[in-house]
């Protein structure tokens, strides 16, 4: 058979075999097409390549285009098998005058025919051809060669068929398909649009695996798409808006793409658009805000105007969607707008290096207030049957972000919604596994198939903690929260989260949000200790909380990098101990002694004597561990000193325990070794408070202080109360 015959067989074979995409016009059954049966028999009995080629040619003549059905296709496969197409794909010895690609084209055409059967598309003999097929996508050749184009089409048909099988995407990614598709798209050769379509499908099916296997190539595609987006002047810019979110990496968007993406979005959103044109742009902007914060927006006038435009559009969309009862809500668009509103909240509350000027902040806060009012209006209408829907979770999230920064406005509406928020948080807390799934659904709904990051925490209560911290300071909201059972829920939540930090858990892999959530819980409890002490005394959940604080602090104060959490736990425990001083658990039990020893360690290690050049006397200075976080720590430290002072007369065993720790002696020694001028008045007052109560509570403490030059030190620092106490017998 000549080269021309081979080519003809390939092309004619394609005409018949590839007709599987069409609906069968006739059902070629055995009894109705004896000619086909005879040719299939010849194909089965062929003894060499030439006979197989000839038989294939006869089969294609017997089966007209559009006549082939799945059964006939399978019988052709049974006659040909995989051995022959395998040889065609890998042979390096073509007949004289016949280009190699003619043989490969026929091999790919046969595979494409077989892959029309889903069972064959997942066959190992097809899967092991993936690397070979990928080479055809990137091979150089004559762009006008019809045979080569046909082979590329068949290659994409094979890969697309494999992608449609249950485990197909995984096999394609492992076989290097993602890189090959990226290179084929970037080369803009024949079929590059098919490469992009298949890439989109693989990213949608297995995004994480795609990025793991081919990150450099995918980033190159992202750069190319971003440049196209920035330059696009026609309708393609709207198509790119829908494509680009899929190509944003799960970690950080490359800075070199920021300018193009922002410029393209600015041009779209700055125009008068219909909703179908605007919504993909809002979703892309939300995806960028989720991944990059405001880093993708340029500094300066243009950037601030663009950010203001984004937030304005988002707020308008939210109000239009949520204020009208009975209106169908486009939840994916509104959730994207929530992400843009959250970006606006962050920028409006940023003191340094904010993109916005003060007048812009004032204007945006007013606009966002109206949108948050619409969110509250929506949540007030949510029935129990909808509480597990992802969109409700997203709505609670944006409300939580607002309440974390602003509780003075919309006070009446917020108070009206508080009972719902407590019930909602309790429902998701009690079904923690489903709540985590809701968080995943929110990420899918809002932005892209990307796995949620820190921006989408897995429980509703954590979203509400900052706002509740502010609200527990106010009488009205606090009474509602107490009435609805929020304190008991918070105690349970704190104990559950604390388990994640206990021995046996790897705290190094804990997200920061867990520790921040624990600290915020402590702040809420501190507010309740001060404003509702009766609640602490009567609610049994606080007894359980106190027990956990006592058993946990000794190990916590020893852990590097967790000083701020230790400060919260120590201060909260000391304040609660004053209210629960009659509890059996605080009567000198091992747990209570361990807790107070750890609290003394926290309070006593805050300051040290530091030598100063050119001076004989040292100065009082912060310890290295405390110095970097003192701005966040100092209020807790002073409150802890005050609380410890209040515990001394209530717990008779505490003063002797403090004496055994040598804290009073070391404190006087520290004060005696530094210049009094280096000790601020508030520090003097805090130290004197502790020393006076210890001296009053225990004779041995007074004697130890006198031996440590306590009276002289008290005189130097004008501690009149301490000086008088030590002068007494």
Curated annotation (Swiss-Prot):
Instruction: Give the N-acetylserine positions (modified residues).
Output: 2
Where does the source fall among the domains of life? Answer: Eukaryota
InterPro entries named among the record's database cross-references:
ARM-type_fold, Neurochondrin
The record's Gene Ontology biological-process terms are:
bone resorption; neuron projection development; regulation of neuronal synaptic plasticity; regulation of postsynaptic neurotransmitter receptor internalization
Induction info: Upon tetraethylammonium (TEA) treatment.
Gene Ontology CC entries for this record: cytosol; dendrite; endosome membrane; glutamatergic synapse; membrane; neuron projection; neuronal cell body; perikaryon
User: In this UniProt entry, which cysteines form S-S bonds?
Assistant: none
Has the keyword Zinc been applied to this entry? no
Query: Which N-terminal stretch is annotated as signal sequence?
Result: none
Could you list this entry's UniProt keywords, alphabetically sorted: Acetylation, Cell projection, Cytoplasm, Endosome, Lipoprotein, Membrane, Methylation, Palmitate, Phosphoprotein, Synapse
- The PTM Asymmetric dimethylarginine maps to 75
Task: Assign the protein's first listed, main location to one coarse class.
Answer: cytoplasm
For this chain, the Swiss-Prot or TrEMBL PTM comment says: Palmitoylated. Palmitoylation by ZDHHC1, ZDHHC3 and ZDHHC11 regulates the association of NCDN with endosome membranes. May also be palmitoylated by ZDHHC7.
SUPFAM superfamilies (UniProt xref): ARM repeat
Lipidation sites, kind S-palmitoyl cysteine, are 3-4
Q: In which tissues is it expressed?
A: Expressed in brain and in peripheral nervous system (at protein level). Weakly expressed in neurites.
Which of the residues bear the PTM Phosphoserine?
2, 448
Localized where? Answer: Cytoplasm, Cytosol; Endosome membrane; Cell projection, Dendrite; Postsynapse
The membrane topology of this protein is: Lipid-anchor
Q: Name the job this protein performs.
A: Probably involved in signal transduction, in the nervous system, via increasing cell surface localization of GRM5 and positively regulating its signaling. Required for the spatial learning process. Acts as a negative regulator of Ca(2+)-calmodulin-dependent protein kinase 2 (CaMK2) phosphorylation. May play a role in modulating melanin-concentrating hormone-mediated functions via its interaction with MCHR1 that interferes with G protein-coupled signal transduction. May be involved in bone metabolism. May also be involved in neurite outgrowth.
- Family classification: Belongs to the neurochondrin family.
Assembly, in brief, is: Interacts with MCHR1. Interacts with SEMA4C. Interacts with DIAPH1 (via FH3 domain). Interacts with GRM5.
What is the name of this protein?
A: Neurochondrin
The protein's organism comes out as: Rattus norvegicus (Rat)
Q: Which gene encodes it?
A: Ncdn
């Amino acid at each position: 058979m000549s080269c021309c015959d081979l080519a003809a067989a390939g092309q004619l074979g394609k005409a018949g075999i590839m007709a599987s995409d069409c609906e069968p016009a006739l059902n070629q059954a055995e009894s109705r097409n004896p000619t086909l049966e005879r040719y299939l028999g010849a194909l089965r009995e062929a003894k060499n390549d030439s006979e197989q080629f000839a038989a294939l040619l006869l089969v294609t003549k017997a089966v007209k285009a559009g006549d082939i059905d799945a059964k006939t296709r399978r019988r052709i496969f049974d006659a040909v098998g995989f051995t022959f197409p395998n040889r065609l794909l890998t042979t390096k010895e073509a007949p004289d005058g016949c280009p190699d690609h003619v043989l490969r084209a026929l091999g790919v055409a046969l595979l494409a025919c077989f892959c029309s059967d889903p069972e064959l598309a997942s066959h190992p003999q097809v899967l092991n051809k993936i690397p070979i097929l990928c080479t055809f996508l990137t091979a150089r050749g004559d762009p006008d060669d019809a045979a080569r184009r046909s082979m590329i089409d068949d290659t994409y048909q094979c890969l697309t068929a494999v992608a449609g099988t249950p485990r197909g995407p995984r096999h394609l990614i492992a076989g290097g398909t993602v890189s090959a598709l990226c290179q084929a798209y970037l080369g803009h050769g024949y079929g590059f649009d098919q490469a992009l379509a298949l890439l989109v499908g693989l990213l949608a099916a297995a995004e994480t695996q795609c990025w793991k296997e081919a990150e450099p190539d995918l980033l190159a595609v992202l750069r190319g798409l971003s440049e196209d987006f920035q330059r696009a002047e026609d309708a393609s810019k709207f198509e790119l808006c829908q494509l680009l979110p899929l190509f944003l990496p799960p970690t950080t968007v490359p800075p070199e793409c920021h300018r193009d993406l922002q410029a393209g979005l600015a041009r779209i959103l700055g125009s008068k658009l219909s909703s179908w044109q605007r919504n993909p742009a809002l979703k892309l902007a939300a995806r960028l805000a989720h991944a990059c914060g405001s880093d993708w927006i340029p500094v300066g006038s243009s950037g601030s105007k663009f950010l203001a435009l984004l937030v304005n559009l988002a707020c308008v969309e939210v109000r239009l969607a949520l204020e009208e009862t009975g209106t169908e809500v486009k939840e994916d668009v509104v959730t994207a707008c929530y992400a843009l509103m959250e970006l606006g909240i962050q920028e409006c509350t940023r003191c340094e290096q904010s993109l916005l000027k003060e007048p812009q902040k004032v204007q945006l806060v007013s606009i966002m207030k109206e949108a948050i009012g619409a969110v509250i209006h929506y949540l007030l209408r949510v029935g129990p049957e909808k509480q597990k829907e992802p969109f409700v979770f997203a709505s609670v999230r944006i409300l939580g972000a607002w309440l974390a920064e602003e509780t003075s406005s919309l006070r009446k509406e917020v108070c009206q919604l508080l009972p719902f928020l407590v019930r909602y948080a309790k429902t998701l807390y009690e079904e923690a596994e489903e709540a985590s799934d809701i968080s995943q659904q929110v990420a899918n709904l809002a932005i892209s198939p990307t796995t949620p990051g820190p921006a989408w925490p897995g429980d509703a209560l954590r979203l509400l903690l900052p706002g509740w911290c502010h609200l527990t300071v106010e009488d009205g909201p606090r009474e509602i929260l107490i009435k609805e059972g929020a304190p008991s829920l918070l105690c349970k939540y704190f104990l559950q989260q604390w388990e994640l930090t206990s021995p046996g858990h790897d705290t190094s892999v804990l997200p920061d949000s867990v520790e921040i959530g624990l600290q915020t819980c402590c702040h809420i409890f501190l507010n309740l200790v001060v404003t509702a002490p009766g609640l602490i005394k009567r609610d049994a959940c606080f007894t359980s909380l106190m027990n956990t604080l006592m058993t946990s602090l000794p190990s916590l104060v020893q852990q590097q990098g967790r000083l701020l959490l230790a400060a919260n736990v120590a201060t909260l425990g000391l304040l609660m101990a004053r209210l629960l001083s009659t509890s059996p658990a605080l009567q000198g039990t091992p747990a209570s002694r361990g807790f107070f020893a750890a609290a003394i360690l926290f309070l006593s290690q805050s300051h040290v004597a530091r030598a100063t050049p050119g001076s004989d006397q040292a100065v009082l200075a912060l310890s290295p561990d405390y110095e970097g976080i003192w701005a966040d720590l100092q209020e807790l430290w002073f409150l802890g000193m005050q609380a410890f002072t209040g515990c001394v007369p209530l717990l008779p065993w505490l003063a002797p325990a403090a004496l055994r720790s040598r804290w009073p002696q070391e404190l006087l020694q520290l004060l005696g070794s530094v210049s009094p001028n280096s000790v601020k008045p508030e520090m003097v007052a805090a130290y004197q408070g502790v020393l006076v109560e210890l001296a009053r509570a225990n004779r041995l403490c007074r004697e130890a202080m006198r031996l440590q030059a306590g009276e002289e030190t008290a005189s130097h620092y004008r501690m009149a109360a301490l000086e008088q106490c030590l002068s007494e017998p």
